[in-house]
Regions:
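Active-site and adjacent substrate-binding regions of carbohydrate-active enzymes
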Residues: 1-150
Length: 150
């Protein structure tokens, strides 16, 4: 199995900014798998949304805008230390449902469910084995109350 770690942030970014250019460019470069191998396509897991897989794909401005939108939608972030004085976002701690909830074009989330279902449809349609995270079956939102007490 080849885990498609780049898929979650690229797919979410495409919906948030109504621009699939990064997702399209990345997907066209995916090599065909050899016999006995397959991609594992997922957009949610217990680990949050990995940001590191966007390195070399997103430019600085795109990454900055992406992280800002995720923060507005309720994300907390985990960081990795680059050196003594510098850290970078490692992952966004937000459910996919909440990540897709609000965009600059849909400020009240009128089409959040449509984005959520469409994101899963795209993930399922890609070459490979689709993996749907259990919590995604229910459109789970962030649990802020539990986050605060842990």
């Amino acid at each position: 199995m080849i885990y498609n770690f780049s898929l979650p942030p690229l797919l979410i970014q495409a919906f948030l900014f109504e621009n699939s250019s990064y997702l399209n460019k990345w997907s066209k470069k995916l090599p065909k798998t050899k016999n006995g191998n397959s991609y594992l396509n997922f957009i949610a897991s217990h680990d949050g949304i990995g940001i590191r897989p966007t390195e070399g794909i997103f430019n600085d401005k795109t990454l900055k805008n992406f992280l800002a939108r995720l923060k507005k939608n309720g994300s907390k972030f985990s960081y990795r230390k680059i050196n003594k004085n510098k850290k970078k976002v490692y992952e966004a701690n937000i459910t996919v449902f909440d990540a897709l909830k609000i965009t600059d074009y849909d400020k009240i989330g009128k089409f959040s469910l449509e984005r959520y279902i469409s994101a899963h449809a795209i993930m399922i349609s890609l070459d490979g084995v689709p993996a749907i995270y259990f919590n995604s079956l229910f459109g789970t939102s962030n649990d802020e109350a539990k986050f605060v007490i842990t």
